[in-house]
Amino acid sequence: MSEKIGILAIGHGSRLPYNKEVVSEIAATIAKKHPDYVIKAGFMENTLPTVMEALADFDGTGVTKIIAVPVFLASGVHITEDIPEILKLDPETNEGKITVDGNEIPVTFGKPLGHHELLADLVFERAMEVM
């Protein structure tokens, strides 16, 4: 059986709709560029779907592994405590198992965006837009 990967983009969430739109558009762009992967978006607070609801949305997709990636710039309590708890991750390996379609499959958790040259370029681009 070949591996079919699901990617869960995790956003913070907000009472304002723009936050959901941005994270959902990022997930849609990833899906368009990488059609062999199943891409979902979920949110930590104030926005649906929740992370748990987004994980449930992988049912019926045939995924054999899920990679959860926070769409956050830096680590905070959601990254270090809340998301690992939701995903039931082993604190030493950052890996866990979740049930999809009645089967236990591995889930791993990526790092926040952090410093990256592309982000630095984007910040500079945004500055130039208002110059």
From Swiss-Prot:
Principal EC category: lyase
Organism annotation: Methanococcoides burtonii (strain DSM 6242 / NBRC 107633 / OCM 468 / ACE-M)
GO MF term list: cobalt ion binding; nickel cation binding; sirohydrochlorin cobaltochelatase activity
Pathway: Cofactor biosynthesis; adenosylcobalamin biosynthesis; cob(II)yrinate a,c-diamide from sirohydrochlorin (anaerobic route): step 1/10
Domain of life (superkingdom): Archaea
SUPFAM superfamilies found in the cross-reference section: Chelatase
Gene coding for it: cbiX
Binding locations of Ni(2+): 12, 78
Binding residue positions for substrate: 73-78
Family membership noted in the UniProt record: Belongs to the CbiX family. CbiXS subfamily.
Residues the entry annotates as binding Co(2+): 12, 78
Name used for this protein in its record: Sirohydrochlorin cobaltochelatase
Listed EC numbers: 4.99.1.3, 4.99.1.11
One BP annotation, GO: methanogenesis
Subunit structure: Homotetramer; dimer of dimers.
Catalytic activity: Co-sirohydrochlorin + 2 H(+) = sirohydrochlorin + Co(2+); Ni-sirohydrochlorin + 2 H(+) = sirohydrochlorin + Ni(2+)
Cited function: Catalyzes the insertion of Co(2+) into sirohydrochlorin as part of the anaerobic pathway to cobalamin biosynthesis. Involved in the biosynthesis of the unique nickel-containing tetrapyrrole coenzyme F430, the prosthetic group of methyl-coenzyme M reductase (MCR), which plays a key role in methanogenesis and anaerobic methane oxidation. Catalyzes the insertion of Ni(2+) into sirohydrochlorin to yield Ni-sirohydrochlorin.
Keyword RNA-binding belongs to the record: no
Residues at the catalytic site: 12 (proton acceptor)
InterPro entries assigned: CbiX-like (IPR002762), SiroHydchlorin_Cochelatase (IPR023652), Sirohydro_Cobaltochel/CbiX (IPR050963)
Alphabetical keyword list: Cobalamin biosynthesis, Cobalt, Lyase, Metal-binding, Methanogenesis, Nickel
